[in-house]
């Protein structure tokens, strides 16, 4: 028996079956870096329309976690897909480098500034620490396959950026948005500083809930408001609070103008309570006997005076919409120095903003004899006892409720009125303009718009000052007596900015005011405050994007961060850009959810369900992590577990196997010489290229809409269903057995070439390492990297008016599936070995029969059987099986007649008819010794 193996066109490629990504990817990264891949892309895209995704800077502290990976990979997919779509999309990664978390780390290392080290030494240590953290995170981000200008990232602590942050503030001041005021701000007594809204977290805390009597100054006047002429005992307005420590700062009692209040007689006294809450107050106070003497509205009681239970002065009843009937008594203790609602209503009534609490959370001297120097949360018990002694305590109980805490220390915070600098929301119409700007932005998903609109509509003025060491200085001079800004503030800030651009923020603290103020130095002092770090990152559209030459003066197209950034970076950027430039800093804002485990639980070290991106890359490789990110609908929570990653690895293998099949069967194909013209190609080959064309249209649209999970789904459908289980299966016979350079094989290779050219581009934004590997194994002259390319424009398909159009092949796919079911059953029953042992008869209704017959003798190649014929549906015998999917089709089979050809494995009657090739079938003889078989359809 002759060996005909060397007459076959066996698949061959250097592209390995196993990805071995964890081992191979680092070598690819080395090559990308050494050859300056990012620079090559920029050169290739120069002059194209731009798309700027501006990187929200992660904080330069600690290792990257799985959430960081999701964020950076999503950004990279967008940047690369925009490149494919014909854009120049530069990506400059950034880091947020100032602020409290870094200060705390450095304090642990060298102590607090002003103790063991000077403030200047402390800042130097902070800068060094932040730089080290940046380098550590950078390595991991690069390992993810994220392409960017990693050698020239932006850092908020770059001298030039620090200077530009000062310039951003200067512009906001020039536009009239800054004001100074004593205002209650979130204050952490451990930090000794105010906190931004985004730095506040809520945890459950047990507090003392108290009902307190404030006695009426003029009993008769108050009684008359209720239509009562005489009462038994004093009248008191009862307030409710869960912060007894704030009572020394009480300056009023707030009522709701529209609520009904009742004067209630209890034993020896009268209480004023909201009518709807009388019963609940009586119940908790243990009062069983009472009588309602009269009623009036809150507005009737406005400006009546009541005595503070222990501070020795009286306070007014005032009206506010913030008073509700959810809990309490309907009367709210009001301390303008300790609450934003209290402050707002206090301004309306001209109340004193009392602030008896120091930065360390202890009462100042002169507050009250038994309270002076006491920490506020320890003072709660003292205040309750004081109220009890004074006969003012109606009731006390423990209450578990959600309470604001410092994100860093996890300890309860307070509202404390401090002299601070604010960007006003309403002084120059910033709120109104921001709300208008939001409408012009595309929010993805669209619920982001309502979310940020609500936040902007309800947010207080933005306190931008901090009392910290490591931060950008506000760079302001104020008058020693009036505390007014220097009239030349804008000019002076530019002078400071120039110095900071040369020497960094230390230049401000080293600056002798006389150097730039001259004679005014005697009357003006430097403001010691630093800027909120959210101002640093929120101004990067100006301090970075506007000045980096790569961006060519274009403003950002997209911001992309986690959904917590509506109140963080998206908000601060919107406020600053609108205050500076009168417009939003972005055109699109895309948000992704947080990572959770396979059961939907938050990632937590204590539960032990965290997954480290470093571990995944070291075990499975970066492309598996990237494919997992792309496969997930990122608009909700993003689930990750070993099982989920294993599924991504399985999907990856299917895609890789498809790519390998394409490459292996392009063996010996030179696209410059061997391409077959579309009109001369076998019909099924044109169909396959057409399926790639249809898939590409959907994939391009999904990339355009940032629906990456749909990209992956379509990619999988194309590889597994259209290619893997149909086309790639049926071409094996032609690919392996047809004449090597005959048109039947070259037609097939032409299709595979076009499909591979398209597929590698679809993959590149997501599975970047593998796409690069495929690119280097594709035949033909090409650019060095797939990442400089655009979507493949060489695809074509079948015309709709052809008889064998897409509809025809879609039906044939179904027919083949039905035949497979019959043959699979026969295999299970051991009636046949492989499908080539079968000769199939398809009994079909006339129209279907005509379509099947149009394939002539090539129907068998589609069905992968040695013979196939079509007969009338009515002629089907009892042994024919009715198709489940196609009403007018029945199927039967027999064992194929003839002998098995050892070369193509088909059973035919013409094996051995040619003496020189006595073992071969006629088709194989033509392919081995003749001009090669002719195929028209399949």
From Swiss-Prot:
Q: Does the keyword ATP-binding apply?
A: yes
Q: Which GO terms describe its molecular function?
A: aminoacyl-tRNA deacylase activity; ATP binding; isoleucine-tRNA ligase activity; tRNA binding; zinc ion binding
Which residues participate in ATP binding? 605
Q: Which domain of life is it from?
A: Bacteria
Instruction: For the motif 'KMSKS' region, give the residue ranges.
Output: 602-606
InterPro entries linked to this entry:
aa-tRNA-synth_I_CS (IPR001412), aa-tRNA-synth_Ia (IPR002300), Anticodon_Ile_BEm (IPR033708), Ile-tRNA-ligase (IPR002301), Ile-tRNA-ligase_type1 (IPR023585), Ile-tRNA_ligase (IPR050081), M/V/L/I-tRNA-synth_anticd-bd (IPR013155), Rossmann-like_a/b/a_fold (IPR014729)
Question: What is one cellular component GO term in this UniProt entry?
Answer: cytosol
Q: Name one GO biological process term.
A: isoleucyl-tRNA aminoacylation
- Residues binding Zn(2+), per UniProt: 901, 904, 921, 924
Question: Motif 'HIGH' region: which ranges?
Answer: 58-68
Q: Which Gene3D superfamilies match?
A: 1.10.730.20, HUPs (3.40.50.620), Valyl/Leucyl/Isoleucyl-tRNA synthetase, editing domain (3.90.740.10)
Q: Which reaction does it catalyse?
A: tRNA(Ile) + L-isoleucine + ATP = L-isoleucyl-tRNA(Ile) + AMP + diphosphate
Q: Which SUPFAM superfamilies match?
A: Anticodon-binding domain of a subclass of class I aminoacyl-tRNA synthetases, Nucleotidylyl transferase, ValRS/IleRS/LeuRS editing domain
Reported EC number(s) for this entry are 6.1.1.5
Keyword annotations for this protein, in alphabetical order, are: Aminoacyl-tRNA synthetase, ATP-binding, Cytoplasm, Ligase, Metal-binding, Nucleotide-binding, Protein biosynthesis, Zinc
Q: Cofactor note from UniProt?
A: Binds 1 zinc ion per subunit.
Q: What span is annotated as the signal peptide, if there is one?
A: none
Question: Which residues make up the binding site for L-isoleucyl-5'-AMP?
Answer: 561
- State the needed cofactors, names only: Zn(2+)
Q: Where is it located?
A: Cytoplasm
- Protein function: Catalyzes the attachment of isoleucine to tRNA(Ile). As IleRS can inadvertently accommodate and process structurally similar amino acids such as valine, to avoid such errors it has two additional distinct tRNA(Ile)-dependent editing activities. One activity is designated as 'pretransfer' editing and involves the hydrolysis of activated Val-AMP. The other activity is designated 'posttransfer' editing and involves deacylation of mischarged Val-tRNA(Ile).
> Quaternary arrangement and interactors, per the entry?
Monomer.
Q: What is known of its domains?
A: IleRS has two distinct active sites: one for aminoacylation and one for editing. The misactivated valine is translocated from the active site to the editing site, which sterically excludes the correctly activated isoleucine. The single editing site contains two valyl binding pockets, one specific for each substrate (Val-AMP or Val-tRNA(Ile)).
Query: Which protein family is it in?
Result: Belongs to the class-I aminoacyl-tRNA synthetase family. IleS type 1 subfamily.
Q: What is this protein called?
A: Isoleucine--tRNA ligase
Gene assigned in the entry:
ileS
């Amino acid at each position: 028996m002759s060996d005909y193996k060397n007459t076959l066109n066996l698949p061959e490629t250097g592209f390995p079956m196993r990805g071995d990504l964890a081992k191979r990817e680092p070598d690819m990264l080395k090559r990308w870096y050494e050859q300056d891949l990012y620079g090559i892309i920029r050169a290739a895209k120069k002059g194209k329309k731009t798309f700027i995704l501006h990187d929200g800077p992660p904080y330069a502290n600690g290792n990257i976690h799985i959430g960081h990976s999701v964020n950076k990979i999503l950004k990279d997919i967008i940047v690369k897909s925009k490149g494919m779509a014909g854009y120049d999309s530069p990506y400059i990664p950034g880091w947020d480098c100032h602020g409290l978390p870094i200060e705390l780390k450095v304090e642990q290392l060298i102590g607090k500034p002003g103790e063991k080290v000077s403030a200047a030494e402390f800042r130097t240590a902070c800068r060094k620490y932040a730089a080290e953290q940046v380098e550590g995170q950078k390595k991991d981000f690069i390992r993810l396959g994220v392409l960017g200008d990693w050698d020239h990232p932006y850092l908020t602590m770059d001298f030039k950026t620090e200077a530009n942050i000062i310039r951003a503030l200067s512009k906001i001041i020039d536009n009239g948005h800054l004001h100074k005021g004593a205002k209650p701000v979130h204050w952490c007594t451990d930090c000794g500083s105010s906190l931004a809204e985004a730095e506040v977290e809520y945890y459950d805390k047990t507090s003392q809930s108290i009902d307190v009597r404030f006695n009426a100054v003029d009993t008769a006047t108050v009684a008359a408001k209720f239509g009562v002429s005489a009462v038994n005992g004093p009248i008191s307005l009862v307030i409710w609070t869960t912060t007894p420590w704030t009572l020394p700062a009480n300056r009023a009692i707030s009522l709701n103008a529209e609520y009904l209040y009742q004067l209630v007689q209890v034993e020896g006294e009268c209480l004023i309570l909201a009518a709807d809450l009388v019963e609940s107050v009586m119940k908790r106070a243990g009062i069983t006997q009472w009588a309602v003497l009269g009623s009036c509205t809150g507005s009737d009681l406005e400006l009546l005076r009541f005595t503070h239970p222990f501070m020795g002065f009286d306070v007014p009843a005032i009206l506010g919409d913030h008073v509700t009937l959810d809990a309490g008594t309907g009367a709210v203790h009001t301390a303008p120095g300790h609450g934003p609602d209290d402050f707002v209503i206090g301004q309306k009534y001209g109340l004193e903003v009392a602030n008896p609490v120091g930065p360390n959370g202890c009462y100042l001297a002169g507050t009250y004899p038994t309270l002076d120097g006491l920490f506020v949360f320890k003072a709660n018990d003292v205040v309750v006892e004081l109220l009890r002694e004074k006969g003012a305590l109606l009731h006390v109980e423990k209450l578990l409720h959600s309470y604001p805490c410092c994100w860093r220390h996890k300890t309860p915070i307070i509202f404390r009125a401090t002299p601070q600098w604010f960007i006003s929301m309403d002084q120059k119409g910033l709120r109104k303009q921001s709300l208008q700007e939001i409408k012009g932005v595309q929010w993805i998903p669209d619920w982001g718009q309502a979310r940020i609109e609500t936040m902007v509509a309800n947010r207080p003025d933005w306190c931008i000052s901090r009392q910290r060491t490591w931060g950008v200085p506000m760079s302001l001079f104020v008058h020693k007596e009036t505390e007014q800004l220097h009239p030349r503030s804008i000019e002076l800030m530019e002078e400071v900015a120039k110095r900071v651009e040369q020497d960094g923020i230390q230049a401000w603290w080293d600056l002798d005011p006389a150097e730039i103020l001259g004679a005014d130095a005697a009357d003006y002092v430097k403001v010691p405050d630093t800027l909120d770090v959210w101002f640093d990152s929120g101004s990067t559209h100006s301090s970075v994007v506007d000045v980096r030459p790569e961006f060519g003066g274009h403003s950002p197209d997209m911001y992309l961060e986690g959904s917590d950034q509506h109140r963080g970076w998206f908000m601060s950027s919107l406020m600053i850009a609108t205050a500076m430039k009168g417009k939003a800093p972005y055109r699109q804002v895309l948000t992704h959810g947080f990572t959770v485990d396979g059961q939907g639980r938050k990632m937590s070290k204590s539960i032990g369900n965290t997954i480290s991106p470093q571990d995944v890359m070291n075990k499975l490789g970066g492309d598996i992590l990237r494919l997992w990110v792309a496969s997930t609908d990122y608009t909700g929570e993003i689930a990750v577990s070993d099982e989920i990653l294993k599924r991504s690895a399985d999907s990856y293998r299917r895609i890789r196997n498809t790519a390998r099949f394409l490459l292996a069967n392009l063996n010996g194909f030179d696209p410059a010489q061997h391409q077959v013209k579309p009109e001369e190609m076998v019909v099924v080959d044109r169909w396959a290229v057409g399926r790639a064309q249809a898939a590409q249209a959907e994939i391009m649209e999904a990339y355009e809409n940032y629906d990456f999970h749909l990209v992956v789904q379509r990619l999988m459908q194309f590889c597994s269903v259209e290619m893997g289980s149909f086309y790639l299966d049926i071409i094996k016979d032609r690919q392996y057995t047809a004449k090597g350079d005959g048109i039947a094989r070259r037609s097939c290779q032409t299709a595979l070439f076009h499909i591979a050219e398209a597929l590698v581009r679809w993959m590149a934004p997501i599975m970047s390492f593998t796409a690069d590997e495929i690119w280097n194994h594709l035949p033909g002259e090409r650019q060095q990297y797939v990442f400089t390319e655009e979507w493949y424009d060489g695809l074509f398909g079948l015309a709709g008016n052809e008889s064998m159009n897409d509809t025809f092949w879609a039906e044939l796919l179904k027919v083949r599936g039905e035949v497979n079911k019959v043959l699979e059953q026969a295999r299970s029953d051991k009636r046949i070995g492989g499908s080539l042992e079968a000769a199939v008869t398809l009994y079909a209704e006339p129209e279907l029969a005509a379509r099947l017959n149009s394939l002539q003798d090539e129907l068998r190649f589609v069905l992968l059987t040695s013979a196939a014929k079509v007969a009338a549906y009515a002629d089907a015998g009892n042994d024919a099986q009715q198709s489940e999917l196609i009403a007018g089709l029945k199927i039967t089979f027999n064992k194929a007649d003839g002998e098995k050809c050892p070369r193509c494995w088909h059973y035919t009657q013409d094996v051995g008819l040619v003496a020189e090739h006595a073992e071969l079938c006629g088709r194989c003889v033509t392919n081995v010794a003749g001009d090669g078989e002719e195929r028209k359809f399949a």
